[in-house]
Regions:
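AMP-binding/adenylate-forming catalytic core of the ANL superfamily
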Residues: 1-60, 72-75, 85-86
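Hydrophobic/anchoring residues in structured secondary elements
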Residues: 18, 66-67
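Residue-level recognition of the N-termini of beta-strands and the immediately preceding loop/turn
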Residues: 62-64
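Acidic/polar alpha-helix N-cap and adjacent early helical turns
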Residues: 85-93
Length: 93
């Protein structure tokens, strides 16, 4: 949630969930699943990392980025982390 809060502060991010994706070297790679404010010009991974660098420790910075049309949430607004993890894993495999 800390990483999500920082990434929400980027002007190009409308909504975001952050999940761990299995990675050979790191065990798990922090991956941001982002719905951009402007789908025609989504933020890049480098932009998000630069934005978050002042507020987060290096190991918390996203190592992956998946752009989606909409971040899936329940009718009550709860994050669907299973969907986000599946989406991120499918995009990085």
């Amino acid at each position: 949630e800390e990483v999500e809060g920082v990434l929400h502060g980027h002007p190009g991010v409308a909504d975001v969930l952050v999940v761990g994706v299995p990675h050979e070297r790191w065990g798990s790679a922090v991956t941001a699943v982002v719905a951009p404010t402007d789908p025609a010009a989504p933020p890049t991974l480098d932009e998000l990392r630069a934005h978050a660098r002042a507020d987060l420790a290096g190991y918390k910075l996203p190592k992956g980025l998946v752009i989606v049309d909409e971040v899936r949430r329940s009718p009550a607004g709860k994050a669907d982390y299973r969907w986000a993890a599946d989406t991120a894993a499918a995009a990085t495999s």
